[in-house]
């Protein structure tokens, strides 16, 4: 019946919305930003940037794990990604506004891997996406899925040093 089909479609959509997305966030210019602020304020600057990233991802019920001083691993649901996409990844601008006397603004690169069969492949896609974001000069979000690449933000076209991009195809 039509009701059964409607109900089935609702379950399919809900299942799709709950799919996990792996992502990476890098502070593009960490060293330059740290050098541009007094030493006594460096830990505060890092804490403010950390807080912005944690709040932004936390607000969509995502998880953030700091991997290194300038690298973060994130996990979110597909419906959370839709919200970030709608607000055009406002975190990119929010982090640039963090100023406690630093003469250089911090910029971020965000890489997300979408619509994959496995979590491992989502992470591989996220790594390809972050490499592309860095190769294009940072300050942008790059989304990789099985259909291709989508870019948000980023004005500077440039090639990164020592960058090799490996194309990963789904089995």
Write out the residue ranges for each language-model feature.
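Surface-exposed, flexible loop/turn segments at secondary-structure boundaries
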Residues: 80, 118, 149
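Alpha-helical scaffold within the catalytic cores of cyclic-nucleotide enzymes
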Residues: 50-61, 81-104, 123-132
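Catalytic-core segments of nucleotide cyclases and related cyclic-nucleotide turnover enzymes
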Residues: 12-13, 89-92, 115-140, 158-162
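Residue-level detector of conserved catalytic or cofactor/ligand-binding positions
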Residues: 163-171
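Catalytic cores of large soluble enzymes that bind and process phosphate-bearing ligands
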Residues: 45, 83, 111, 118-121, ...
